[in-house]
Design a protein with these regions (language model features):
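Extracytoplasmic gating/loop element in the C-terminal half of outer-membrane beta-barrel translocons
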Residues: 87, 99-102, 231, 285-286, ...
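Extracellular/periplasmic, surface-exposed regions of secreted and cell-surface proteins
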Residues: 86, 106-109, 144-145, 150-156, ...
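Short beta-strands and strand-coil junctions in structured, solvent-facing domains, enriched
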Residues: 18-23, 40-43, 55-58, 135-136, ...
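Short acidic/polar hinge/loop motifs at secondary-structure boundaries
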Residues: 1-17
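Conserved small-residue
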Residues: 48-93, 178, 340-342, 529, ...
Length: 693
């Protein structure tokens, strides 16, 4: 979506639940966003030009302390050059450093031109757009250029329609800021010692007469986060992406009768990307894999998708009954091919010359990653209506996914059924209720497991430069993941201007494929199991109001609330070990985390539960103990201590839109209520003594 020119979009609609899954497959099990792009209009040629400029600055920053200077334990002895636990600063020693000053004013320039023309039989649309952005972090750039063409033609008394389109996108970026510590200049900016002069490091490189090159100036040291001069990261740790993408589409539809239509569509989406990473000499050796000469990496991933479908659409009335039927078949083929080369620049190489010939022959790594997935499908949906007040909806889809090759289940079927009734059309309601509909549905959606689990594959060992077979235990009977969902809902319109929607849902997911880290002999290192049972249950509420005064001023407001409760009903229970025949039971699974904070799945818990196995040492009264040296004492390898769940209790949103004589003003407020947040940024700031807390 981010690659699409906003001026090319005609409308955006959202499909949810079974309707999305029936048309677009298991990838749309949670819904689908359908974007309709513009087409040419009948009439005189129209040319539209638009231009806008956005400015950005950091809005909310962490709270920093500027009372204590460089050092540790209240002293400045020169041994702790990157900590701010030093002596109290005074007017003479206070530098007045403000991290906000590191950031630039970000600017984004967007310019576009569109052309529309057409006759009753042929319509043409063309657009060109450019987005040029300079980020708030120094030396961060993003550019995108879009070119779009679409032509629609009618034949045979408008019964036959041909629609063709083409888009070409050029995108390049430099130093997009990522999360983590090593390649993120914000880390040393936030943790910079408060007793040092930040202005001195703005000249981030100095001439090294011995090496005859400029090297990084960073007297503060790397610390345990491998920090570098933030300006060196911005200007001498370069990461660039250059992407070219083209999309071609064609559709042909024919109206056999006024109630029967057939159509066929094909879409091709290809992208070619070139990624480069250049780390200059004297960069942190953790990043350069030990080289003081620098590091170079290049990768060229190519991605392609071909989608095609045929559809038959029926829309007919039979007296009091209406029938809408869609029957079709589709195929989608995804391919990925990446060739990459990386390594440190050799000791006798030329510093800061970035090409594959200058890499260390003993450490350079060449890789190629290639895969293909294909899914063939047939699907159908039918909606039977009675007197425009009662509707029965049925959908069904069967997928043959390549991930299921060599398994006992080579395809999977997922159906749905829904019933809705417009009560306001059936009985007379109080005058305050303009519209009332109740609805209920059930759907069962399948999802294929990861590719190559059931097909023999080999992986390349970069260390030994040999091919090795995958070492997971031979898999027998694997089945697709399955989610069964129930939903009940109510939609109302009150007092002409109010809208109310309420939904309750229950979703059970099982047959999940994962590696529970159980012991396997016979030379295998892992075994994949299909088990698990996770439940999601919740409610969604929406309330809206819209009114127009004197045909000029309109106010529209919408409030939404959602609450979801996630619960792990079962992890691994009575799974028979294929070697020993013994039952396997697991009610705890560590799925990773950051530092001492770990996401641990437990029966009865949720997927967002966060635990720790470290705590501060406390006395018999529960008070935190302090060592004779004045340091906190930590105790590791404790039983799981639950910190909480990262899932919120509910999500809230409130939007307002005001319009008056062509002027529009809008505002959106969102909130997450409940749930915990683990901030590695806050933890690092506390450790280095720069946070206000």
């Amino acid at each position: 979506i981010a690659d699409i020119n906003p001026d090319d979009i005609e409308s955006i609609s959202v499909l949810t639940g079974a309707a999305a899954a029936a048309l677009y497959g298991s990838n749309a099990a949670n819904g689908a966003i359908v974007i309709n792009t513009k087409r040419g209009k009948v009439g005189k040629m129209q040319v539209s030009v638009s231009s806008n400029t956005d400015f950005s600055k950091p809005f909310v920053m962490p709270r920093f302390q500027n009372r204590y200077g460089t050092g540790s334990k209240g002293k400045s002895d020169g041994s702790s050059t990157n900590l701010s636990w030093g002596p109290l600063l005074n007017d003479a020693s206070r530098r007045g450093y403000e991290p906000r000053d590191f950031f630039d004013t970000g600017m984004t320039y967007t310019n576009s031109v569109t052309l529309s023309t057409g006759t009753e039989k042929n319509q043409t649309f063309f657009s060109a757009a450019a987005v040029n952005s300079e980020g708030i972090v120094p030396n961060n750039r993003y550019n995108r250029f879009n070119f779009t063409f679409r032509n629609t033609t009618s034949f045979l008394n408008d019964k036959l329609k041909l629609d063709i389109g083409a888009s070409y996108i050029i995108q390049n970026d430099r130093n997009m800021t990522n999360q983590g510590a090593y390649s993120n200049p914000i880390v040393p900016v936030y943790l910079f010692p408060r007793g040092d002069d930040f202005n001195l490091i703005k000249v981030f490189e100095r001439w090294d007469p011995a090496r005859k090159i400029k090297t990084m100036y960073w007297p503060q040291g790397e610390g345990d986060l491998r920090m570098q001069n933030p300006y060196w990261i911005a200007y001498r740790n370069l990461r660039t992406n250059n992407k070219k993408r083209y999309m071609l589409s064609a559709s042909l539809s024919y109206d056999i009768t006024d109630w029967l239509n057939v159509s066929g569509r094909v879409r091709v989406d290809n992208s070619n990307t070139k990624y480069e990473q250049k780390l200059y000499a004297s960069s942190n050796t953790t990043l350069t894999e030990g080289s003081t000469q620098g590091f170079y990496a290049i990768a060229k991933p190519d991605e392609s998708q071909v989608y095609a479908d045929v559809l038959a659409n029926i829309n007919k009335r039979f007296g009091d009954y209406s029938l809408v039927v869609n029957v079709g078949a589709s195929i989608v083929d995804n391919k990925y091919d990446e060739l990459s080369y990386r390594g440190p620049i050799r000791a006798n190489g030329i510093p800061n010359v970035f090409n594959v010939f200058d890499l260390d022959n003993t450490q350079k790594k060449a890789r190629q990653d290639e895969w293909e997935e294909q899914t063939q499908s047939i699907f159908a949906s039918a909606e039977l209506g009675w007197k425009s007040m009662l509707y029965l909806t049925l959908t069904g889809r069967n997928d043959w996914a390549s991930q299921l090759a060599n398994s006992s289940s080579t395809c999977f079927f997922y159906p749905s059924v829904g019933l809705s009734a417009i009560i306001s059309e059936m009985v007379k309601l109080p005058s305050a209720i303009d519209y009332l509909k109740i609805r209920g549905s059930f759907s069962s959606v399948g999802m294929p497991y990861p590719r190559n689990l059931t097909s023999p594959t080999f992986e390349y060992d970069e260390t030994t430069q040999t091919w090795k077979p995958k070492t997971h235990y031979p898999i027998g009977d694997l089945k697709p993941e399955r989610t069964n969902s129930w939903e009940l809902g109510l939609d109302m319109r009150l007092f002409k201007d109010f809208n109310l929607g309420v939904s309750w849902y229950l979703a059970n997911t099982f047959n999940q494929t994962f590696d529970p880290k159980i012991s396997v002999s016979s030379g295998y290192t892992t075994i994949y199991l299909q088990t698990g049972y996770v439940r999601n249950q919740g409610v969604e509420l929406s309330l809206g109001y819209g009114h127009t005064w004197k045909k000029d001023f309109r106010w529209q407001t919408n409030f939404t609330l959602s609450h979801n409760k996630n619960k792990i009903i079962e992890l691994v229970k009575d799974y028979i070990h294929p070697e020993t025949g013994e039952p396997i039971n697991k009610d705890r699974l560590d799925v990773g985390g950051l530092g001492k904070a770990r996401f641990i799945l437990k029966t009865g818990g949720s997927l967002g539960d966060l635990y720790t196995q470290a705590d501060l040492k406390r006395d018999d009264n529960g008070m935190v103990e302090i060592s004779p040296a004045g340091a906190l004492i930590t105790v590791n390898n404790q039983p799981d201590i639950k910190l909480g769940s990262v899932f919120p209790k509910c999500n809230l949103a409130w939007s307002n839109q005001f319009s008056w004589k062509g002027f529009n003003v809008s505002a959106l407020l969102t909130a997450r209520i409940g749930g915990i947040v683990y901030s590695a940024t806050a933890a690092a700031m506390d450790q280095y003594g720069v946070s206000e807390s």
